[in-house]
Amino acid sequence: MALAHATYRRLLGPTWSPVAPERLRRAVGGKVVLVTGASSGIGEATSELLGRNGAHVLLAARRGEVLDEVAGRIRAAGGEASAYAVDLTDLDAVDRLVHDSLADHGRVDVVVSNAGKSIHRSLADTTERFHDVTRTNALNYLGPVRLLMGLLPQMRERGSGHVVDVNSLNVDLPAANWAVYTASKSAFDAWLACIAPEVRVDGVATTSIHFPLVHTPMSAPTYDPALPALTVDAAAQVVGRVLVTRPRLLIPWWVRLAAPVQAAAPEVSDAVTARFLRRKDR
């Protein structure tokens, strides 16, 4: 399995490979980096990676006791970390996070917007569960927007900063049974794309990473762990790389090829998917 995961990562190409540690230390050393969804998965691995490389990591997630454990590991390894228990669906709590992080540290240099809710459910199974739509949008779109609206002004005033959006290739290749999730992730991706030129004028970079499958606790209920995918540590290395290279967008090369085909012939794509779903339901 490890060989399959390593091969998968190599197939993504050099822009998805780990960056040299000394380059990462130069990019994040001494900076205050806020990571949402830091209690598990990509957020946890990213927080530990950045902590090892000189960043003061602000860990944000709902589970305060787990955040304390992550912060403890970062400190034990010689890094700096502060934990903030917050539910990003609670906009008042998001405002408190903005206030407390700036009051405690004076600034936030980088935001890694990683927290998210994945939901794999058909339209039929969602019809009586509209709360799935509202909660998923609250966590994947509204909460991150509120957070950045609070933190971007101080970045723009200083003339520096970086926002990294940990997103999904579902944004580029919409798939059946992923409507609620994909719509929420696409909304934040579009919002960030729209503000990117506005904040770039003031020295603030934005990066959207459209990840392929990553084996995380969030993906575990849906995907077989034997499927080739990125590990959370490999995904964290990708986040580390974009903090150095600062691209506007990072997506797998094969998505760049497939997305135009799907856009040019959506009827064909829909027909193939519908045929697959009919077979699956038999």
Describe these PLM feature segments.
Residues S208, D224-A263:
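C-terminal helical subdomain
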Residues G64, Y84-L97:
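The beta1-alpha1 cofactor-binding region of Rossmann-like NAD(H)/NADP(H)-dependent oxidoreductases
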Residues N53-V70:
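Conserved glycine-rich Rossmann-like NAD(P)H-binding loop of the short-chain dehydrogenase/reductase
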Residues S39-S40:
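Conserved glycine-rich cofactor-binding loop
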Residues S118-T134, N177:
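Conserved mid-core segment of classical short-chain dehydrogenase/reductases
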Residues L148, S184:
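Active-site helix of classical SDR
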Residues M1-G29, T273-R282:
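Non-catalytic terminal and boundary segments that flank Rossmann-like NAD(P)-dependent oxidoreductase
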